[in-house]
A protein has these predicted regions:
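Structural motif
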Residues: 9-13, 100-116, 157-164, 204-211, ...
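Soluble catalytic regions of membrane-associated enzymes that act on cell-envelope
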Residues: 49, 54, 94-98, 102-108
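Beta-propeller fold detector
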Residues: 114-127, 171-179, 211, 217-225
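Conserved beta-propeller blade signature
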Residues: 95-97, 150-152, 161, 197-199
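Alpha-helical transmembrane signal-anchor/signal-peptide segments
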Residues: 1-2
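Conserved beta-strand positions in repeat-built beta-propeller and related beta-rich domains
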Residues: 98-100, 154-156, 191, 200-203
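Extended, hydrophilic extramembrane loops/domains of integral membrane proteins
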Residues: 154, 201, 237-250
Length: 250
């Protein structure tokens, strides 16, 4: 895509062929699906797969993470939500937790420790093999999303755990990610399609996607260092497009 004051926006492919706006919309149907649908030009199928505006919207996502996001000082307390509320909508969290050689829950309404819940979560986590202290963790405790998957936590032995609160009780699963990988950074995703659980990077700056069934897939890209690089992922029901950059550009 080229833009100039004199000629406006022009669109070309790798061979130099120029396309009109309407043609370009059809080349990227999952990106311009609303425009195509409004003009009755959205196909019924793409690559043999049925598509509707709802299906496309459900599969589209954008993920962005900068080095600043990773390098920021981490809070001592992390809010935790109820992943299975009584009502259909997620509720604002009323509790937070801190981790030391155990996990401790604090009721944010009166700043008191919930000893019963703290003991229960701590017991279950340790029964599942969790070794404190926590090396790193990632969660997104906001009700402005469709669902909640709690936290991905990396324990002291580089094992990756999935921890969330369901009906006030602990949900703790070891994901099976090999400790030998030395996972150093995790980012929970919670995309609308509910296919993935998070993105992980190891000690060698390899990038992985962790699916909801805890299967792990290494992405075939160059090294990605979360401490110095920026990462942008745009995905749809067919493909992921990744862009890795730094202070000097892409």
């Amino acid at each position: 895509i080229q833009s100039s004051k004199d000629n406006g926006v022009k669109r070309y492919d790798a061979n130099g062929t120029e396309y009109t706006v309407a043609q370009f919309d059809s080349i990227l149907p999952t990106f311009y699906y609303r425009q195509l649908f409004s003009k009755d030009r959205l196909p019924d199928t793409i690559n043999g797969k049925e598509v509707t505006p709802k299906i496309i919207a459900h599969g589209n996502f954008t993920f962005k993470q900068s080095a600043r996001d990773v390098n920021v000082t981490k809070p001592a307390l992390n809010m935790i939500m109820e992943s299975m509320p009584d009502r259909i909508d997620l509720e604002n969290p009323i509790e937070a937790f801190r981790t030391t050689d155990r996990i401790t829950f604090i009721d944010m309404r009166d700043n008191t420790v919930n000893e019963k819940k703290s003991a229960l979560f701590d017991k279950v986590m340790k029964q599942k093999g969790f070794e404190f202290p926590v090396r790193t963790l990632s969660g997104n405790p906001t009700n402005r999303k469709e669902y909640d998957e709690g936290y991905l936590m990396v324990d002291n032995n580089h094992r990756v755990f999935h921890v969330k609160q369901t009906k006030g009780l602990p949900y703790v699963r070891e994901t099976g990610v090999a400790p030998e990988l030395g996972i150093e950074h995790v980012a929970i995703t919670e995309f609308s399609n509910r296919k993935t659980l998070g993105l992980l990077t190891d000690k060698d700056n390899n990038l992985y996607v962790l699916n909801r069934d805890y299967t792990l897939h290494k992405l075939p890209i160059d090294k990605y260092d979360p401490k110095t690089n920026t990462l942008t992922i745009m995905g749809d029901i067919f493909y992921w497009t990744l862009k890795i950059g730094d202070e000097k550009g892409v």
